[in-house]
Amino acid sequence: MANDKIVIHGARAHNLKNIDVTIPRDQLVVVTGLSGSGKSSLAFDTLYAEGQRRYVESLSAYARQFLGQMDKPDVDSIDGLSPAISIDQKTTSKNPRSTVGTVTEINDYLRLLYARCGHPICPNDHVEITSQSVEQMVDQVLELPERSKIQILSPVIYQKKGQHKKVFEHIQKEGYVRVRVDGEIYDISEVPELEKNKKHDIAIVIDRIIIKEGIRSRLFDSFEAALRLADGYAVVDVIGQEEMLFSEHYACPYCGFTVGELEPRLFSFNAPFGACPECDGLGIKLAVDEDLVIPDRSLTLREGALVPWNPISSQYYPQMLEQFCLSFGIDMDTPFEKLSKEEQQLILHGSNGRTFHFHYENDFGGVRDVEVPFEGVLNNIYRRYHETNSDFTRDQMRLYMTELTCSHCHGYRLNEQALAVKVGGIHLGELSEKSIQDALAFLEQLSLTEQETMIAKPILKEIKDRLTFLQNVGLGYLTLSRAARTLSGGEAQRIRLATQIGSNLSGVLYILDEPSIGLHQRDNDRLLDSLRKMRDLGNTLIVVEHDEDTMRAADYLIDIGPGAGQHGGEVVAYGTPQEVSENPNSLTGQYLSGKRKIPVPKERRKGNGKKITVVEASENNLQNITVDFPLATFTAVTGVSGSGKSTLVNEILKKALQQKVSRSHAKPGKHKKITGFESIEKVIDIDQSPIGRTPRSNPATYTSVFDDIRDLFAQTNEAKVHGYKKGRFSFNVKGGRCEACKGDGIIKIEMHFLPDVYVPCEVCHGKRYNSETLEVHYKGKNIAEILEMTVEDALEFFKHIPKIKRKLQTIVDVGLGYVTLGQPATTLSGGEAQRMKLASELHRSSNGRNFYILDEPTTGLHAEDIARLLKVLQRLVDNGNTVLVIEHNLDVIKCADYLIDLGPEGGAGGGTILATGTPEAVAKVSTSFTGQYLQKILNK
């Protein structure tokens, strides 16, 4: 059989319908189709799973126990398979120690660069700290012009107060006759008495020499004597020139600041040797945040200005506060902001040892009657956070704490010694703070000595290659110090992609999950070039993608469908993008050929005249911008990757609104103020996180339709005869559920050296309920059979029950009719979870004062899904609500009522408002990249 194809026979993972697929090797292959059609089942759960399993199978049983086992995918055979590497979006590191630099391994090379070519500079005296042997010192002095006059000095005292009489006695005993005191040369017997309270410098004059031939051995002796007397330091005073400083140690000859030998571990913030001792290399420290403790300073103490001390379950702290205020004469009915500075300090930081009488009786008769100092609210929270053994108390105290930049290392994570070492005039912390684009430019023009250039050449090549790859996948705006946990899924995936390109492997099967997410159209071409480069190295790329540019760039396109869930799982079309676009059965093909498209709305909403305004936003790269968000409109925030969209919407607007409207503890990013929030009642963030963390959560429970279904079952005659209430039909509580599997329907069996096996429960056979409960029927079906229904079937089944029908209809409206009511939440994709949340919002009665925020809602969505999503979003706005999206997808952007375009670039080059207004207005702004692409699509 030819080796130029991967041939799959009988793939049945999830909803795949026993399909046969042939995929050409060493090509860029795009797998597309509706959300839920089976693309990921083919790419990840079949191809990747089998490629990985075969590799792991080849290892010893001992090694396999550490790697974890993979199930054999449900497929008859796969031929022509290569070792598989999956680059998805879910495996982003949440470790606070992971940064862009560590994930890409650039930090490893930078540490090597600084260890081999770094110059330690004393932070106090700003002189270079060098370590030299006596021979090197002598050689350096002999390079001076002939007949130069020099004095070799031994600096025994540097900037120390005192008269130093014993020092002079010791010098005399050693037989030396001249000393230099505070820059003046004296005979040892004629040294004036020094001022006791002034700092002085004292150096012994070891030798006076004129540079000429034959003095080498004399220099050796003089240096050795100088170094011995001054603990490894020597100074050469060249008459008429600057002094030369020498040290046997990596230590400053003036203040003694020591660096030690330069080695790579000194520059690692994850090693005790290099980490800042104050923050342990995290760059941040937890501190109690005054703004979270007193979010509203216009309140009085009696009205609850101190949020952590408001009476919830105990009166202990409220009574303490009242008795303290009485004792110290503080008025509890004055707004906190109007209290004097001293009174505020007392409340926040404590009485500094001054006591007051505290009497307290608890509900159980316990009495406390003591004279105590007042601890202060901030100190109290900090102490309780660190001393408590209760997770609940620690979590509660954590709500009032925030991460502040470490004052010791200024957020650079490294200790003082590591930060003293510089290459090109900057230390590693400063280089890590530069954007990838700027770091590359800095290294390109780095000037090194001839010897350093030879050492640094291979190191710099590796660093520059990796930085270039990151820039080529549109990440030039990120800094190397950026924490990995703060990256979006798309950014994290492209970082791993850049790392793989850097590895230069060939013959590998790469499987990618929507690499274009979070990428502006402008950056897409560079990403595609990177993918082609990987292909040209001799790799097979299988990309699950909906982006039109990526599909058109593919060598081979596979369309899975025709629908989603049970309506999908078949190969609808395959071939070149041109061949697929000509296939009448392919939805993707119809969008590619332009036969189907998402229409531009006939008119744009003007809103209700009200707006929310964020004033002077300056978090991250935002340049002090003031932004209006019109209410009762569909608004999109656009801009190139890294321009500040997420900072503006997620870090400032969302958190500020949650703080004002929902009384949340979230602390918004830097801004002056926010106005207009009185016009909204709820802030709802509809993201792509799972709707539940356990298999017990499912669409029926999440949308609360299961409550109505259980009510219905409790009203049947059979249920009434047995006295069953609504709770009998829950699989989460004792009573109606199967106790053998606790309502899970499956039992986990742990296997050593093999994957854990999940088997259906032998008692209930996977039904989740006991036999008595399953005897209760509604219209011929029991509760377990209802959970096995798809939403579409359930809609037909319950069409005469308005309450249930309304909730199920909204799930169908968002395109999830194929999902079963009992499908575990953990098996829903991000896009499906997000649409389930939208469905849940749609069936709730709303007064039209909700503010919905969606961050890239088109992730994982086909053009047909996007058309459905837009209908749902427009429905929410038609009801008077406000919908705000962060989006790159032009089909969504062109349908918005109002755009806010940030830019012009990412990182430091972004953060300003380029254009606002309707899509038509933004399309006319020549400086806006979004506008340039919009113009093309609006003119189609």
PLM region descriptions:
Residues M1-K940:
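Conserved phosphate-binding elements of NTP-dependent enzyme cores
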